[in-house]
Each structure stands twice: as structure tokens, then as C-alpha cells.
């Protein structure tokens, strides 16, 4: 554009926000979308991290239903200890995902032992193959930048297998 900006990312709230009502979120998202259309802006929705793909997929379906045709860049927690993920989750207010973890003790056990949410990544990858607004993702390197980069490089280079919806790197991250 005129000032050197090619794309604009705005906050997407698949799990709502503790500070803003859902009605207000929806109202302003629609206004931003309409403005982007009238001004021919490349707008994308960028989400917070979460631990459960279900509410995110439902949120995307709601966007499609309302004809809010914006690409979505999903926030994904990189490999980290369960304690670290829980602490960041509590600070960030990703409440629905934290409740999901509390109710699904096997997921908690998985996170305690392998420190990455492979099942959710598999669900998001499957969903991105459909006619969905999910176009990209970005990582939150809570467990450290180096570990997250290594993990991403192993996935990008194909150095993994998928067993029972879980990604197994050929080499350990830690």
C-alpha cells in the first residue's frame, strides 16, 4: 500500500475474550471486514494460542456462515513443559482451552510427557485441507525459541511419522 504495508493482521478470538463481550467482538470484526473490502485491504485474522481445535473449527465455520471471508493465521503453542503452557494459558485467558485440558486428563498426561500438542496440530492440518479459512499458523515459543525452531524444522523437513493422530519426530526435541 501507500505506506509500505501489504497485509494487516487483526486479532481473532476463537474462544472469546475475558475483556470484551462476544457481541462487541462480532460487531467490530464485521466492521473491520467491511472496511477491508471497501478499501481493498489484505486483512487476515491472527489468533491467540489454544489447546483444543474444536472451538477454533466452530469459530471458523461461523466466519464462513457470516460470509466473513478472511484468511486465518492460527496461534499454536510450540513444545514446552505442561507447567509453562498452563502458566501462559492462565496469563492469556485462554479459558476454554484450559477447561478442556482439565476435563481431559489423558490430554494433560500427553502434554506432561511429550510437551507438544500433536493431536491438535493433526486436526488443524486436516481442517486446513478442507474449504476452510485456515491458511497459516504462527508459533508461540514458550519452551524456548531454539526448541521451537528445531521442532518446526523437523516437521517441515518431513522428519516425522504420524501414529494415532500424534506426530512423532524421528529425533527428540529436547
Question: What are the language-model segments listed below?
Answer:
Residues 59-60, 152-155:
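Short Gly/Thr/Asp-enriched flexible loops that form oxyanion-binding sites at enzyme active sites
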Residues 1-34, 64-129, 142-145, 155-174:
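Active-site pocket-lining/capping segments in soluble small-molecule metabolic enzymes
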Residues 14-18, 42-48:
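Surface-exposed cleft-lining segments at the edges of enzyme active sites
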Residues 44-52, 74, 137:
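Conserved strand-turn element in the central/C-terminal portion of the radical SAM core barrel
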Residues 136-142:
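C-terminal structured interaction module
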Amino acid at each position: 500500500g501507500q505506506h509500505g504495508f501489504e497485509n494487516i493482521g487483526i486479532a481473532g478470538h476463537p474462544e472469546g475474550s475475558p475483556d470484551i463481550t462476544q457481541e462487541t467482538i462480532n460487531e467490530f470484526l464485521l466492521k473491520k471486514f467491511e472496511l477491508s473490502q471497501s478499501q481493498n485491504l489484505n486483512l487476515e485474522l491472527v489468533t491467540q494460542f489454544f489447546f483444543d481445535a474444536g472451538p477454533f473449527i466452530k469459530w471458523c465455520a461461523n466466519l464462513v456462515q457470516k460470509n466473513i471471508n478472511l484468511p486465518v493465521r492460527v496461534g499454536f503453542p510450540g513444545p514446552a513443559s505442561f507447567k509453562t503452557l498452563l502458566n501462559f494459558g492462565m496469563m492469556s485467558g485462554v479459558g476454554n482451552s484450559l477447561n478442556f485440558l482439565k476435563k481431559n486428563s489423558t490430554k494433560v498426561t500427553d502434554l506432561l510427557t511429550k510437551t507438544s500438542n500433536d493431536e491438535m496440530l493433526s486436526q488443524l492440518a486436516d481442517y486446513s485441507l478442507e474449504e476452510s479459512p485456515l491458511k497459516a499458523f504462527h508459533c508461540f515459543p514458550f519452551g524456548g525459541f531454539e526448541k521451537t525452531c528445531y521442532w518446526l524444522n523437523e516437521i517441515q523437513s518431513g522428519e516425522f511419522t504420524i501414529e494415532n493422530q500424534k506426530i512423532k519426530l524421528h529425533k527428540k526435541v529436547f
